């Protein structure tokens, strides 16, 4: 939980700023069974207006405010009736509430114009949320999404300091000021190194990301970027905790003549050799590999993935760095005690992106050693995005229909959850899971990881 001194500072800051803006109420989505919220009578749809007289701007404010032991809540129910509730609790007791949104005062959108932005490489006509350019430091703190730091106001920097919002996840791309400003099409992007100094002076930390665009920020520029970041990775309290290097993703919808070059096998091998050489240097000077390549580099280069130990504690797993090794490790654990056979013969299918198919064949082969079980793995391209080699999370409903229609999928199709919008059964092209199921005429089971895949395969 938040320590007492931080809470005092944070609540003080909240009270100063509470009249400067007027966020929307926090709408309750669910209440944990047996929680204080349930005891108080909260219901989905109720609106939390104020906590101790302060209107929370977001989930971070809510967490800071509710750590107080004495709370005065102002709530409006679905009928529009206002309720005032006073309660006492322990500092570490949660109210047990979740909300429909994490931000009650709106999303901070990006003010850059990066030519490689994936949001700009989508077709028009889909749900609005697909076109929102998130560059919000609060979502970075809460969920690990990346931001550029170019749209922060003085009040934002003060809040980051007072509420100790650390670590944040920062899209760096380049540390050389002119180059970063060029890449982001924003003069404020050149302030990054001063901003890292600001974090250092306050003992705040970040994780970094570099999206490689061949001919722009690779080669010598990449060397400079990683070595500049590594300077801030030293000491007992490093500012930069880790750096992920990821390849630029290009789709068939991107603007013509954008000057961007796709990553090919030759480029991938050059970048791997370059970064692995720097890793050896960082291991000696920092005690960590510090900078890691996302799994796609090795798959594109047709090279073996590094050993699991090379990724240390997987600081960038959610960014696709070491995620395949982590999955295979979990699969080894999940398949350690497989039955020699299943009573009722079973045939099912598992669909993944073509880029990762070869890396996962060993996992499917191990399941196929169970007598009576047949698991077929389908690695699909994406005609939707115009990518032959695609990661699993970018496959759309249309891609699945095109790749799987009229195929023998067996009794069940195992579908990784990363293809669907979080919390909803809808793909990136707005096709619903129900529509896909009806078209393919096969039961579909959503799987979230190795344990789910093994359970789905061997269960009756």
Tell me what each language-model feature is.
Residues 1-21, 27, 302-460:
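Radical SAM enzyme core and accessory elements
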Residues 7, 63-99:
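PDZ-domain C-terminal substructure recognizer with occasional recognition of PDZ-binding tails
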Residues 24-33, 53-56:
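Short, structured beta-strand/loop micro-motifs enriched in basic residues and often containing a Trp
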Residues 37-57:
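Conserved PDZ fold ligand-binding element
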Residues 53-60, 78-80:
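Short acidic beta-strand-loop surface patches of small beta-rich interaction domains
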Residues 80-82, 89-238, 249-278:
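Conserved Radical SAM active-site core
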Residues 208, 245, 293, 377-379, ...:
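A structural preference for short, hydrophobic beta-strand core positions in alpha/beta folds
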Residues 216, 238-266, 286-309, 382-387:
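Flexible glycine/acidic-rich beta-alpha junction loops that bind and position SAM and/or redox cofactors
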């Amino acid at each position: 939980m938040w320590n007492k001194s931080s809470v005092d500072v944070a609540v003080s800051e909240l009270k100063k700023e509470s009249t400067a803006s007027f966020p929307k109420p926090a709408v309750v989505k669910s209440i944990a069974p047996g929680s204080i919220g349930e005891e108080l009578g909260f219901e989905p749809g109720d609106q939390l207006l104020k906590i101790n007289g302060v209107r929370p701007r977001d989930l971070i404010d809510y967490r800071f405010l509710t750590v107080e032991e004495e709370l005065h809540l102002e709530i409006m129910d679905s009928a529009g009736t206002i309720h005032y509730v006073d309660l006492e609790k322990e500092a570490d007791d949660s109210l047990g509430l979740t909300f429909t949104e994490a931000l009650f005062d709106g999303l901070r959108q990006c003010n850059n114009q990066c030519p490689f932005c994936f949001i700009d490489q989508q077709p028009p006509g889909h749900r609005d949320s697909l076109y929102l350019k998130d560059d919000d430091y609060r979502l970075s703190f809460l969920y690990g999404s990346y931001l550029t730091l170019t749209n922060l106001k003085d009040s934002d920097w003060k809040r980051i300091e007072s509420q100790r919002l650390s670590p944040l996840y920062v899209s760096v791309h380049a540390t050389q000021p002119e180059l970063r400003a060029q890449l982001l099409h924003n003069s404020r992007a050149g302030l990054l190194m001063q901003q890292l100094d600001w974090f250092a002076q306050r003992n705040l930390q970040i994780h970094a990301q570099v999206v490689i665009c061949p001919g722009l920020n690779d080669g010598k520029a990449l060397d400079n970027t990683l070595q500049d970041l590594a300077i801030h990775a030293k000491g007992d309290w490093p500012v930069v905790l880790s750096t992920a290097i990821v390849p630029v993703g290009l789709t068939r919808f991107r603007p013509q003549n954008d000057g961007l070059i796709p990553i090919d096998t030759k480029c991938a091998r050059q970048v791997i050799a370059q970064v692995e050489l720097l890793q050896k240097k960082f291991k000696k000077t920092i005690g960590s590999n510090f900078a890691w390549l996302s799994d796609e580099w090795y798959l594109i280069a047709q090279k073996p993935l590094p050993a699991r130990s090379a990724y240390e504690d997987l600081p960038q797993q959610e960014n696709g760095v070491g995620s395949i090794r982590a999955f295979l490790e979990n699969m080894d654990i999940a398949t350690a005690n497989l039955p020699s056979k299943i009573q009722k013969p079973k045939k099912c299918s598992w669909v993944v992106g073509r880029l990762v198919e070869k890396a996962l064949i060993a996992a499917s082969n191990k399941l196929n050693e169970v007598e009576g079980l047949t698991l077929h793995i389908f690695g699909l391209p994406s005609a939707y995005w115009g990518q032959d080699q695609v990661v699993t999370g970018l496959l759309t409903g249309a891609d699945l229909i095109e790749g799987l229609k009229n195929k023998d999928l067996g009794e069940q199709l195992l579908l990784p959850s990363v293809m669907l919008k979080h919390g909803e059964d809808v793909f990136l092209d707005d096709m619903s899971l129900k529509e896909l199921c009806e078209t393919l005429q096969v039961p579909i089971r959503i799987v979230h990881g190795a344990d789910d895949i093994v359970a789905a395969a061997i269960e009756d």
